Design a protein with these regions (language model features):
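Short, charged surface segments at domain edges that flank catalytic/cofactor-binding sites
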Residues: 1-24, 47-48, 52, 76
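Polybasic, low-complexity binding patches
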Residues: 45-55, 63-93
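Histidine-centered nuclease catalytic patch
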Residues: 23-56, 69
């Protein structure tokens, strides 16, 4: 398992088989039961494998970020900050 995935799961005390929700879909009340990807908000060369830079996305939203450009970094960062605040996790850049 890749380091950034381990980091994300560790922060939320999740196992590999845990139900994980897409942070982008969750903001609008949707839950996608498909596969998930842990996405770097700032690219690997720009950011690190820290919880403030890692967001969980369903495959549909991940495609919307990379292939379609429908979701940008600023949107992801804002949604992720609210997600962390809702779980009482301090946001660190």
């Amino acid at each position: 398992m890749q380091k950034h995935i381990k980091e994300y799961l560790k922060h939320f005390d999740l196992g590999e088989q845990s139900l994980i929700t897409c942070e982008y879909c969750l903001r609008s009340g949707r839950i996608d039961a498909g596969g998930f990807d842990i996405h770097h908000i700032q690219g690997r060369g720009e950011g690190m494998d820290v919880i403030g830079n890692l967001v969980c996305l369903c495959r549909k939203c991940h495609i919307r970020v990379h292939d379609k450009g429908e979701i940008n970094k600023d949107q992801l960062l804002l949604i992720h900050r609210y997600f962390l605040i809702g779980r009482k996790i301090k946001f660190r850049k």
